[in-house]
Amino acid sequence: MRNAVILAAVLMMATGANGQTPQTPAPAAAAPAVELKVGDQAPDFTLHGTDGKMHKLSDYKGKKAVVVAWFPKAYTSGCTIECKSLAENGDKIKQYNVAYFMASVDNAEDNKGFAEKEKADFPLLSDPTKATATAYGVLNPNGLAKRWTFYIGKDGKILGIDKEVKPKTSAEDMVTKLGEYGVEKTK
């Protein structure tokens, strides 16, 4: 009998006096990113650039196309190769009416040092909160950005998404795609 009373007391403490299981609120799950597609409105962002400016996507709307080349991590081999490709061939990209950036979830200080080391003549954007990377669906399970490039038209809509970026030829590939997507050339 004594064991039955102890068991009943333990059960009451575990389930509460009313016999209901206590409910602890489940932690809020991060909203899963909807996969962006060609024709979708590109999510707006405001990110710090290595040029010391804040870059807001909507500021370019109606003025020029935008290319955002996401990369995993500053100072790593593939990212270094991609940055060098874009820096060494910037004159070809600048033949188009386009603002182009590399972007990562690295902090601004790391990206600034990386850009200076690789002599990048274009801004690298920092998204340390990972909010923009999440909105673009590029955040991988390790918390780094996937190497994807987004081509965004003057109207703010996505013209193309390159999910097979080749770091060594990224600049040449970017120029080819800008032509394919009908981005106007500068005069």
Q: What do the PLM-derived regions correspond to, one by one?
A:
Residues 18-44:
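N-proximal helix/coil linker or "cap" segments that precede and/or mark the start of modular domains
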Residues 42-43, 65, 146-148:
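Short loop/turn microsegments at loop-to-beta-strand junctions
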Residues 1-4, 20:
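Positively charged n-region of N-terminal signal peptides that target proteins for export
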Residues 36, 45-65:
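A short beta-strand-turn-helix
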Residues 4-14:
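Bacterial N-terminal signal peptides
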Residues 145-187:
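Thiol-/selenol-based redox modules, centered on thioredoxin-like
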Residues 59-80:
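Short active-site neighborhood of thiol/selenol oxidoreductases, capturing the structured segment around
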Residues 75, 80-118, 129-134:
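Structural microenvironment flanking redox-active thiols in thiol-disulfide oxidoreductases
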